[in-house]
C-alpha cells in the first residue's frame, strides 16, 4: 500500500510538472502570434500594442538574398496598404545591417535588429531556422499567412 502511495504521488508530480514545461506555441497559420517587444533608434515596438491592426512581421538575413528582396517588396506594399510593417534582421553584424537599410532605402523606423537585448527570445519564439520568414498577423493577433506572396497580402488585408 505504501508503494502505491509513493507511485501515485510520483505520477501526480510528473503530470503537474510536465504541464508547466510546455513550449511556446509554434508560430503557424491559425495560432496566436508570440508577443514580443523590440526597440530601435526610433523607439519601441510591442506586438501586443498592435491589436486591432494587421501586422506584417518579416525576418530577414544578409546571408539570404531572397529575404532581402522580400523585405523591400513587403515594405513597399505595406506603405501603400493598411498593414503595419515590422522588419527584423537576425544577423549579428548590426553595422552591415544599418548600411543595407540605408542602401536599400528602407524606412529605418520599421527596421529592427534581433541583437537588441529585449529581443533575444524572438528567434526562439518564432522557431526561426533561417532569416527568410514572414507572418501576416490579423487584428486579433492570429497568424493568417506564413511567407505570404504580395497577391496574398492584397487579398487577405483590407485596402
Task: State where each predicted segment sits.
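Conserved redox-active cysteine motifs that mediate thiol-disulfide chemistry
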Residues: 51-74
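Hydrophobic beta-strand anchors of alpha/beta hydrolase catalytic cores
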Residues: 56-57, 85, 134
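N-terminal "domain-start" segment that seeds a small globular fold
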Residues: 20-46
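Short, internal strand/loop/helix patches
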Residues: 98, 102-139
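Structural microenvironment flanking redox-active thiols in thiol-disulfide oxidoreductases
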Residues: 66-104, 118-122
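Generic structural signal for well-ordered beta-strand positions
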Residues: 45-48, 144
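Bacterial Sec-dependent N-terminal signal peptides
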Residues: 1-27
Amino acid at each position: 500500500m505504501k508503494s502505491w502511495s509513493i507511485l501515485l504521488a510520483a505520477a501526480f508530480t510528473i503530470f503537474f510538472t510536465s504541464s508547466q514545461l510546455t513550449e511556446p506555441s509554434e508560430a503557424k497559420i491559425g495560432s496566436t502570434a508570440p508577443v514580443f517587444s523590440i526597440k530601435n533608434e526610433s523607439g519601441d515596438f510591442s506586438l501586443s500594442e498592435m491589436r486591432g491592426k494587421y501586422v506584417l512581421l518579416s525576418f530577414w538575413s544578409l546571408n539570404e538574398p531572397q529575404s532581402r528582396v522580400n523585405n523591400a517588396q513587403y515594405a513597399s506594399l505595406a506603405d501603400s496598404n493598411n498593414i503595419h510593417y515590422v522588419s527584423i534582421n537576425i544577423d549579428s553584424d548590426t553595422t552591415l545591417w544599418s548600411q543595407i537599410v540605408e542602401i536599400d532605402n528602407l524606412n529605418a523606423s520599421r527596421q529592427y535588429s534581433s541583437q537588441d537585448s529585449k529581443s533575444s527570445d524572438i528567434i526562439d519564439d518564432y522557431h526561426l531556422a533561417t532569416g527568410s520568414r514572414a507572418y501576416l498577423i490579423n487584428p486579433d493577433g492570429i497568424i493568417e499567412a506564413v511567407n505570404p506572396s504580395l497577391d496574398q497580402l492584397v487579398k487577405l488585408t483590407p485596402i
